[in-house]
Each structure stands twice: as C-alpha cells, then as structure tokens.
C-alpha cells in the first residue's frame, strides 16, 4: 500500500492554526481545492487574530474554491474567535477541546492531532472506513467504531501514517464503486475481492 499511495506528504502550512483551518476547509472537497483556498486565505489572514477580525464576505471570497464557502467561512471565523478568546490564538492539543470548536468532528480533530501536533491518533474518513472493512481489518458500521477498532488492531507507531496511506489508496485503487482490485497488491489477501469483487473483474 505504501508503494502505491506514496509516503505521507509533508504538511506545508507553517502553523498549527493553519493546519486546523485547512482541515476544516477540506471537508467535502478535493485536495487541490483545499490547497487553493488555503493559500488564498492565509496570504491575507495567516493567524487566528487576523482571521477573527476579517469581514465574513472577504473570507467567503477567498475560500470559495473549497465549496460550501458560506458555511465554512462562518465556521472558521467562529473557530478563530474562540481560539483567541480561550486558547491564546492557537489550537488546543487535546481531542476533547478540539471537539468543542464549531465544525470540528472526530475526524477533523484527529487529523489536527496527527498533522499539527504529531500525536498518535486515528483519523477515519470514508476511505479509511471502507478500506478497513474491505480488507477485513475491522467489521464495523460507523467511522467511530472503525476508529476504536483500528486503534486496537494497528500498532501505535503506524497510526500517524495510516490515514494518509488509506486516503490515497482509496482515491487511486480501492474506489467506492468499481474498485481496481486487480491493480491492488493486497487483492490476494482481501476478503472483499475473494468473496465478491473477484466475480465482477474476471
């Protein structure tokens, strides 16, 4: 999987605050759209202090490439205000405090722990949830169940890398529909391929 997906990319954002905001912007959009919106936003408002005072219409214009820009603009401004008021302008480093921020769920909070603080955490999105179940690593119904199950099944030293690898693999190979099983290096050991997908691809 590492050979196909590639090694984890180095997060280019300079601050923990920028990692948090970019992760919120990444919800329900493509990576390239997130990158464009983040670059435009941080050029004008690189800190929580500046973003908390920015006009909402200006934020909306800058993050428009990320989609759902009106909702996201309200969220990231509200987050910035709370960070300034409660956390000295920086994201908190605990899961519980991150979850207290507007628009921050478990996946977003765990991504911030991983990429901003380099803490072991298990971000689970649709790709991680799908691939984990297809490979038989877990048998779960929800991303939260998958998170807990993977934390038990995967060695802690691999947690930081797992999200990146599975997301990239889910985008390239293990697609939601018509997965490219014959291109997958794991297909000979994959229960999904052996039990059902194989019949569709041979």
Where are these regions (language model features)?
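Catalytic cores of DNA base-excision repair glycosylases
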Residues: 1-202
